[in-house]
């Protein structure tokens, strides 16, 4: 199961959440990970003795409760608090850290952080961060682009011209997200987010030209850090026989499953004389229309059926 260290959580959110170390630095490598029977949202929560969270947050009410504990009971309560599945304690709202809590965290290698932010906001930010960081992931071969604000993944066998097509689309004002190895993360039940690894970011490999830095060539707006995947365009090599057998009036909606998320897909035959950049733009525009409830093929078939019925009625009403 995916997991991260407390150290990484601290480094990624130190300034945003105003985090500071209070104790337990030796536990910086403690892991925070998704459990099979619990969602990511259950990783963070206010102080809970019954179902301890991996990240226990101490807010105003929790701090007041701990302060009311008698010194003889405190050790017992702390023993219940620091369950083996617990990885981190954060004292929020700028509250002072009690000496007993600090000592316990230090002795048991439990990272103890403080924050000046209110606990509800702190937990909301951490939940969103963990949901993205610990999301199930997969890597797909292809080029991921932002075309008309739609995340489009172009796939196909090597040598079909995916990179050249991407370069053409970028020159027409669209943006590159990732080339070759597209990292996909399931950040929601039906949502996939595509990103690029830091090593490959900004680069596009085009045969004959080598590695191109798209940001330097086309400017800042030619690059996007991430995008929700909404459409897959699969390029297939086609000959005359394939084009003859192609169903021109298909009304079936094709989908491809990635990480158990169904994504709309379109197959584009690659043949001599076809302007693939224009076809991709048309496919994206058509997808946007379908999101609005407009289906050109279905509309044409309905119009065709209506015309046939009118012709049939006119034929029946025609005098012999």
From Swiss-Prot:
The active site is at residues 141, 162, 180, 248. Mg(2+) binds at residues 163, 205. Residues 269-274 are annotated as: Important for the catalytic mechanism of dephosphorylation. This is HPr kinase/phosphorylase. Residues 204-213 are annotated as: Important for the catalytic mechanism of both phosphorylation and dephosphorylation. InterPro entries: HPr(Ser)_kin/Pase, Hpr_kin/Pase_C, Hpr_kin/Pase_Hpr_N, P-loop_NTPase, Ser_kin/Pase_Hpr-like_N_sf. GO terms for molecular function: ATP binding; magnesium ion binding; phosphorelay sensor kinase activity; protein serine/threonine kinase activity; protein serine/threonine/tyrosine kinase activity. It comes from the Bacteria. Belongs to the HPrK/P family. Both phosphorylation and phosphorolysis are carried out by the same active site and suggest a common mechanism for both reactions.
